UniProtKB/Swiss-Prot annotation:
GO biological process assignments: DNA repair; DNA replication
Protein name: DNA ligase
Superkingdom per UniProt: Bacteria
UniProt-annotated binding residues for Zn(2+): C416, C419, C434, C439
BRCT domain sequence ranges: 596-677
Source species taxonomy: Bacteria, Pseudomonadati, Acidobacteriota, Terriglobia, Terriglobales
Record keywords, A-Z: DNA damage, DNA repair, DNA replication, Ligase, Magnesium, Manganese, Metal-binding, NAD, Zinc
Residue numbers annotated as active site: K117
Biological role stated in the UniProt entry: DNA ligase that catalyzes the formation of phosphodiester linkages between 5'-phosphoryl and 3'-hydroxyl groups in double-stranded DNA using NAD as a coenzyme and as the energy source for the reaction. It is essential for DNA replication and repair of damaged DNA.
A GO cellular component annotation in the UniProt record: cytosol
Any one GO molecular function term: DNA binding
Family under the similarity heading: Belongs to the NAD-dependent DNA ligase family. LigA subfamily.
Pfam families to which the protein is assigned, alphabetical: BRCT (PF00533), DNA_ligase_aden (PF01653), DNA_ligase_OB (PF03120), DNA_ligase_ZBD (PF03119), HHH_2 (PF12826), HHH_5 (PF14520), Nlig-Ia (PF22745)
């Protein structure tokens, strides 16, 4: 291939890849699947390897570069990145608006722009001749850290912007964009799954995870964690306003190819602002990322300059903060809980504190290393955080330089607090474990896990019933559940004949649970719901899985060396093989169907939104997947159907805007019945 022909093909591939990156990472509307995208990237990599002289810094293959030689350089901002003043109530918000009107003049026409306040890491991106030249953290507001090598790996950050787009957006070739780097909940959950599998403490929240990721010295790690960048401000290279209005700036940034938060609203009155804030707080739990409030800005740049700044914040903008999902309280005690796999988890018992509208009295401390990292003692004051349904976590010790008088060091036990057996710590892992397989705490947690929703789903078998069954010696392993009689259940406290009959019905129904749920219920270390599903689809039967070697297991998605070792250790233990046989005798399903390739639902992507009248979200997801379909968490052009129930949110709106078919539960059930016919 000639040099000219190679150059032409390389540029064509780059344009195609940039186009599809924009559709996927910015618009959430992919046109091709991952395999097709990967093939485009491989072709480009192959051509660039054959013609290294044609490699340019803005090529999609150059997102991941070398490590910074020595940390990150300090660089002054073109214009200070100031924090915003906060308000925490409607009254305070109205007071701010009144001050703005007084300073602007009562006759001034003022328009406000309301935007979701993303809870992430502020970032300034500098472009020279349309090319990404530098990425700076906020730092202290005056001086930030140069994290350009890491910013380049964020797929929603354009590495270059074509002249045509610059002209369309009326933006000079040299400019600055400010925005927020966030870690979506899906990426955060994946990160913590990986950390748990490695024996590490999970990250406390998406914001901390994003901040830690962007400051790592390993760009390849940043590339693996899907960070997003949302642009919200545009400046000239001299740090001056690039546009006359904030709304105009946001539209221009979207034109340039940046991801801009679509949840924004122009308001001409404080009443409209308050309405937007209230809607945002209700909408908060339905987003795929964390927000902690709403930013309200005066729209006009001229009026912004007239209002000016206080010593530390602009007068023309304010952050309305939602109810805190963090709080400060005192650690009254530290107790150790024993999980189903024998893991010992220290838990902080706290003086009651309101966090995000919930009274919190306990928070996990994960393991001994985390207590040491925090420098925590009993009696210390700590900051705790919770986001959505995440278990409260201790984030830091407040004023740890001086512990309050009377604080006590916590010493991790050398014996299991539940059974007194020896505890061990495997080299390379952070957790201590009880090795006694007959430990009552392990058995209790194993039973609760086995019966829980999402596993065998035995409704009515909660902690109170499990404790009584154990206390009376009626169950000693999970297989004993299937030997329980009505007479035994009726003898339990608060268990009449009707309740006993209902519970036995639930137990009997659980015998029909699919193979992946049975695998998940066994409690094999590191085998969660997704891994259990992958194993069931790969092997199709319990017997085939039990005979698989470590090497064979590691060919399965989601199974690495640590997981394969845990699976083999579990099935090589005679006690566990006996348990499996007793469950087989109890009538549980030990075979499963591999995903149907010719199914009517095969290859179809569904998105669930709102509350369905008859099916839970998990039940609907399971039925679709068992019929060969796929359930996604976000709507795109590739979505085939959105299944909408009551109180459907933004996913329904997006489906309507994209023309994606919307069906209700009845239509879904009809599709499933047609599939079974």
């Amino acid at each position: 291939m000639s040099h000219a022909s190679a150059a032409q093909q390389i540029e064509s591939l780059r344009e195609s890849i940039r186009h599809h990156e924009y559709l996927y990472y910015v618009q959430d509307q992919p046109e091709i699947d991952d395999l097709a995208f990967d093939e485009l990237m491989r072709k480009l990599q192959r051509l660039e390897a054959e013609h290294p002289e044609l490699i340019t810094p803005d090529s999609p293959t150059q997102r991941v570069g070398g490590k910074p030689k020595e940390g990150f350089a300090k660089v002054a901002h073109s214009r200070p990145m100031l924090s915003l003043d906060n308000v925490n109530s409607e009254e305070e918000l109205r007071d701010w608006e009144r001050r703005v009107r007084e300073q602007a003049g009562q006759n001034a026409e003022i328009e406000y722009v309301c935007e979701y306040k993303l809870d992430g890491l502020s970032m300034a991106l500098h472009y020279r001749d349309g090319q990404l030249a530098r990425g700076l953290t906020r730092g202290d507001g005056e001086i930030g850290e140069d994290v350009t090598t890491n910013v380049r790996t964020i797929r929603s950050v354009p590495l270059s912007i074509a002249d045509g787009k610059l002209q369309q957006a009326k933006m000079p070739a040299n400019f600055e964009v400010r925005g927020e780097v966030v870690m979506p909940f899906t990426a955060f959950e994946k990160l913590n799954e990986e950390r748990e599998a490695q024996g590490l403490a999970p990250a406390a929240n998406p914001r901390n995870a994003a901040a830690g990721t962007i400051r790592t010295l390993e760009p390849n790690i940043v590339a693996q964690r899907r960070l997003d960048f949302y642009a919200y401000f545009a400046l000239t290279e001299k740090g001056e306003d690039a546009f006359g209005e904030q709304e105009e700036a946001l539209d221009a940034l979207a034109t340039l190819g940046f991801r801009v938060n679509q949840h924004r609203h122009a308001a001409k009155s404080i009443e409209t602002v308050v309405e937007f804030v209230n809607r945002a707080e209700e909408h908060r739990s339905r987003l795929g990322y964390e927000i902690d409030g709403v930013v309200v800005k005066v729209n006009s740049a001229v009026l912004q300059r007239r209002l000016g700044y206080t010593g530390r914040a602009p007068r023309w903008a304010v952050a309305y903060k939602f109810a805190a999902r963090s709080g400060v309280t005192q650690v009254e005690d530290i107790q150790v809980q024993v999980g189903r796999t024998g893991k010992l988890t220290p838990v902080a018992w706290l003086a009651p504190v309101q966090v995000g509208g919930t009274t919190v009295t306990r928070a996990t401390l994960h393991n001994a290393d985390e207590i040491e990292r925090l420098g925590l003692r009993i009696g210390d004051f700590v900051r705790i955080e919770r986001g959505g349904d995440v278990i409260p976590k201790v984030v830091e010790v407040v004023d740890d330089a001086e512990h309050p008088r009377g604080t006590k060091h916590f010493h991790f036990p050398h014996a299991c607090p539940a059974c007194g057996s020896e505890v061990v710590r495997t080299p390379g892992e952070a957790d201590y474990r009880c090795v006694n397989t007959d430990c009552p705490a392990r058995l209790r947690e194993s039973l609760l896990h086995f019966a829980s929703r999402g596993v065998m789903n035995i409704e009515g078998m909660g902690e109170a019933i499990v404790m009584q069954l154990l206390g009376r010696g009626l169950v000693k392993t999970v297989s004993d559940i299937y030997s329980l009689t009505e007479e035994q259940l009726v003898s339990l406290e608060r268990m009449g004949k009707k309740s006993a009959t209902a519970l036995l019905g639930e137990i009997d129904k659980s015998r029909q649970a699919p193979l992946d749920r049975v695998l998940f219920g066994l409690g094999i270390r590191f085998v969660g719901e997704r891994t259990a599903q992958a194993l069931a689809e790969e092997y199709g039967s319990m017997d085939a899985l039990m005979q698989a070697s470590r090497e064979e297991l590691e060919r399965v998605n989601d199974v690495g060396p640590r997981v394969s070792e845990a699976i083999r250790e579990f099935f090589d233990e005679p006690r566990n093989r006996d348990l499996v046989e007793r469950l087989r005798e109890a009538g549980l399903r030990f075979t499963g169907e591999k995903r149907k390739k010719t199914s009517q639902l095969a290859g179809l992507t569904f998105v669930l939104t709102g509350t369905l009248p008859g099916l839970s979200r998990d039940e609907a997801k399971g039925k679709i997947e068992n019929a060969g379909g796929h359930v996604s968490g976000s709507v795109s052009k590739k979505t085939n159907y959105v299944v909408a129930g009551a109180d459907a949110g933004s996913k329904l709106e997006k489906a309507n805007s994209l023309g994606v078919p919307v069906i209700d539960e009845a239509a879904l059930i009809k599709m499933l019945e047609t599939e079974q016919a």
